[in-house]
Structures are given as C-alpha cells and as structure tokens.
Swiss-Prot record:
GO molecular function, one term: lipid binding
UniProt xrefs under InterPro entries: DegV, DegV_domain_contain
Upper taxonomic lineage: Bacteria, Bacillati, Bacillota, Bacilli, Bacillales
Organism encoding this protein: Staphylococcus aureus
One Pfam family per UniProt: DegV
DegV domain ranges (all copies): 4-140
PROSITE patterns cross-referenced by the UniProt entry: DEGV
Role summary: May bind long-chain fatty acids, such as palmitate, and may play a role in lipid transport or fatty acid metabolism.
Protein name in the entry: DegV domain-containing 15.5 kDa protein
Positions that bind hexadecanoate: 61, 93
This protein's UniProt keywords: Lipid-binding, Plasmid
Length: 140
C-alpha cells in the first residue's frame, strides 16, 4: 500500500506543530483586510484575523489559485503516494472545487474530500484521518 499524505487548506486551525508532526501539507487561502493582502497562517494568524473582523475591518477571503494545488499535487505524486486532500466546505468557498479540478490535471492517486465544515470541524476531520492512516500503517 502506498504511503498516504494529507493536504488541506489554511482554515483548519490546527497548530503548526501538529501539521509539521504529521507531515500535513497546507495550501493557504489569501486574505484582504482593508485593502492589504495577506497569506492566511503565514502573514496573519487566526486570532489576528478575528480581531480585524471584530473591529469591523473590510475583510475578504480568496481561494488558492489552481496552480498552487497542481504544484503541490505534482510534487507529492512524484513519490508515488496516495494523496488525501480535504478542504473547507464547498458551500463557503470554491477551494474544494479548485482542488477537484487540479486533481484531474495531475497524474497521481488523489482523493479530494469536501469536509462540509471549517475551522475546528475541518481540523477534527483531519485528526481522524491522521488516526486512520496511523492505524493502517501499523497493520502493514
């Protein structure tokens, strides 16, 4: 069985330590706050983002460009892995649909999941996938 790698977006609110520990690849969303652009979780934290919302800033989010997904999927697929790509709800963003489109453009074993959730709900699902992957690896 191929090694399984998880890809998600920056809305899961999982700690950087957890993401690194479990080799989870994150494709960040873009944020615009009062006309200034940020990369989610790289240039601005969740708490800073929430502070801006609470202070009535003009806040907009933007899904990652398809090229970011293609680049990530191609890089990971070189190692002949199974990619599990789980993202925030398709009802809130086009991120899931972009991930699906990118998965069809890359020669690899890629499963894209619509979490139907965001933030802690998405993070919880990722943690469950991590547990299943760890359990599966112990059976081999």
């Amino acid at each position: 069985m191929a090694k399984q790698i998880i890809v998600t977006d920056s809305t899961s609110d999982l700690s950087h330590e957890y993401l690194k520990q479990h080799n989870i690849h994150v494709i960040p969303l873009s944020l615009t706050i009062d006309g200034k652009s940020y990369t989610d979780q790289a240039d601005i934290s969740s708490s800073e983002y929430i502070d801006h919302i609470e202070n009535d800033a003009d806040v907009k989010t933007s899904q990652p460009p398809i090229g970011r997904f293609i680049e990530t999927y191609e890089q990971l697929a070189q190692d002949d892995v199974e990619i599990i790509s789980i993202h925030l709800s398709s009802g809130l963003s086009g991120t899931y649909n972009t991930a699906v489109q990118a998965s069809h453009m890359v020669d690899g074993n890629i499963t894209v999941i619509d979490s139907k959730s965001i933030s802690f709900g998405l993070g919880y699902q990722i943690k469950q996938i991590v547990e299943l992957v760890l359990l599966q690896s112990k059976k081999i």
